[in-house]
Amino acid sequence: MTAFNVVRFKVKPGSEKAFLDAHKNIGANWPGMRHANIISTGEGGYCIIVEWDSMEAIAAARPQMIETLNGFRHTLDDLGGGRGVTDPVSGPVAFSAK
């Protein structure tokens, strides 16, 4: 069943290019990843939204996701509230509309 993961970030001022560049090759060898988009939410805020074949594919890609995060972690500000530098969620599609 199709699943998505979404991760919210706050990028340090002046680090936007490095943050975006770090994602250029994501998914090249990540089985089950269908599509990824990064959206700008304003004032240094970004979300990556990734479509996957299944929750199992997301779980299998976690080591690569962590490795990628470690490559750009220095570009991120703490989100506060004990969340650290990422605010991730994932789950199977509950409803889909055109």
Where are these regions (language model features)?
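A short, structured loop/turn motif at beta-sheet edges
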Residues: 12-14, 56, 98
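Conserved N-terminal glycine/acidic-rich loop preference
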Residues: 4-5, 19, 46-55
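An amphipathic, aromatic/His-enriched active-site/gating alpha helix that lines ligand/cofactor pockets
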Residues: 24-35, 51-87
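Short, surface-exposed ligand-recognition loops at beta-strand->loop->(often short) alpha-helix junctions
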Residues: 8-21
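Residues in flexible loops and secondary-structure boundaries
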Residues: 17-19, 27, 41-47, 60, ...
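Glycine-rich beta-strand-turn "strand-cap" elements at beta-sheet edges
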Residues: 1-3, 10, 35-47, 71-98
